[in-house]
Design a protein with these regions (language model features):
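Extended serine/threonine-enriched, polar tracts that run as long, contiguous segments within proteins
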Residues: 141-148, 152-169
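Membrane-proximal interfacial segments on either side of biological membranes
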Residues: 1-132, 158, 163-178
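Generic long, charged, amphipathic alpha-helical segments
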Residues: 127-144
Length: 178
């Protein structure tokens, strides 16, 4: 990759690395407007990362997509985003604009109670294994709202379409079709 530092700006182009047992690639532009305010815009791709490590690595994901903590497995994660930063370089969530894509196969739902209730209601063939065959999700964040675009999730013999909106205050409106 390439790194440029000039005029209170840092530009990282096509940096690749291996960390957290995953391959990563990023491009980033940071501008320090003042000692208390900054801007960052970036594109970040992570391949085959453990979901738990992803949420630990990017804690803001837990605010934006709290459902991620309910799964175990490997996913590919892509995000393009821009945001204002505070004096500690933390993302100012209200200014965040982002597009996220998460794709994973053979993911396990960790919340056993939720799975047991679903398995009973939907009469799953396999009531013990809470494996999702595949998930591919597209999400945007803008004006304090998270929009989850309709996506298909496969579990047991069912295929469900899920989509909706979630506000950063954790209120939500989702639609599920089976």
């Amino acid at each position: 990759g390439k790194v440029q530092i000039k005029d209170q700006m840092i530009n990282l182009e096509n940096l690749s690395m291996k960390a957290l047992d995953a391959m990563m690639r990023t491009s980033l532009l940071y501008k320090g407007d003042s000692s208390i305010d900054g801007y960052a815009g970036f594109n970040f791709d992570i391949y085959k990362i453990n979901i738990g490590k992803l949420v630990t690595f990017i804690p803001e994901l837990d605010t934006i997509v709290p459902m991620l903590r309910s799964f175990k497995g490997l996913v590919n994660f892509n995000i393009a985003a821009e945001s204002r930063l505070d004096s500690l370089m933390n993302i100012r969530i209200p200014s965040l604009r982002a597009a996220v894509h998460i794709k994973g196969d053979s993911l396990v739902l960790l919340d056993g109670d939720t799975f047991r209730r679903l398995a009973k209601i939907l009469m799953f063939k396999n009531k013990k294994e809470n494996m999702f065959d595949s998930i591919s999700v597209n999400i945007t964040v803008d004006n304090g709202a998270v929009k989850v675009y309709p996506f298909v999730v496969e579990i047991d013999r069912y295929r469900a379409a899920v989509g909706g909106t979630q506000n950063l205050d954790m209120s939500f409106n989702y639609h599920v079709s089976i």
